[in-house]
UniProtKB/Swiss-Prot annotation:
Family, per entry: Belongs to the conotoxin D superfamily.
Disulfide bond in keyword set: yes
Propeptide: 25-45
Tissues expressed in: Expressed by the venom duct.
UniProt entry keywords in alphabetical sequence: Acetylcholine receptor inhibiting toxin, Disulfide bond, Ion channel impairing toxin, Neurotoxin, Postsynaptic neurotoxin, Secreted, Signal, Toxin
Function noted in UniProt: Alpha-conotoxins act on postsynaptic membranes, they bind to the nicotinic acetylcholine receptors (nAChR) and thus inhibit them. Through its two C-terminal domains, this homodimeric protein would bind to two nAChR allosteric sites, located outside the nAChR C-loop of the principal binding face and at the adjacent binding interface in a clockwise direction. This toxin specifically blocks mammalian neuronal nAChR of the alpha-7/CHRNA7, alpha-3-beta-2/CHRNA3-CHRNB2 and alpha-4-beta-2/CHRNA4-CHRNB2 subtypes.
Subunit note: Hetero-, homo- or pseudo-homodimer (identical sequence, different post-translational modifications).
Signal sequence segment: 1-24
Lineage: Eukaryota, Metazoa, Spiralia, Lophotrochozoa, Mollusca
Name assigned to this protein: Alpha-conotoxin-like Cp20.2
GO MF annotations in UniProt: acetylcholine receptor inhibitor activity; ion channel regulator activity; toxin activity
Domain characteristics, as noted in the entry: The cysteine framework is XX (C-CC-C-CC-C-C-C-C). Displays a mini-granulin fold, a structure composed of two short, stacked beta-hairpins connected by two parallel disulfide bonds. This newly described fold is derived from the same cysteine connectivity as knottins (ICK fold). The name 'mini-granulin fold' comes from the structural homology with the N-terminal region of the human granulin.
Residue ranges that the Swiss-Prot or TrEMBL entry lists as coiled coil: none
Length: 94
């Protein structure tokens, strides 16, 4: 089997439904139901600590720290500030 066919087959078999960006998890809908709800039910994740940027949707980002715009700050103690011409960003002490 040619290498290109193998690569395409692998990409079809292993869809990337989860990815990690800026310290948070983005989860999209899959055929089995609400992907965000399923993500929160795995392991010891506490739904109460999750800040979702798209409430009521089956796609969203879950921040276990502080949310700033559409991104998650690296720590809970960070604050969200607006930088002129650069937009919102996290300001973390120390």
């Amino acid at each position: 089997m040619p290498k290109l066919a193998v690569v395409l087959l692998v990409l079809l078999i292993l869809p990337l439904s989860y990815f990690d960006a800026a310290g948070g998890q983005a989860v999209q809908w899959d055929r089995r139901g609400n992907g965000l709800a399923r993500y929160l039910q795995r392991g010891d994740r506490d739904v109460r600590e999750c800040q979702v940027d798209t409430p009521g949707s089956s796609w969203g980002k879950c921040c276990m720290t502080r949310m700033c715009g559409t991104m998650c700050c690296s720590r809970s103690v960070c604050t969200c500030v607006y930088h002129w011409r650069r937009g919102h960003g996290c300001s973390c002490p120390g």
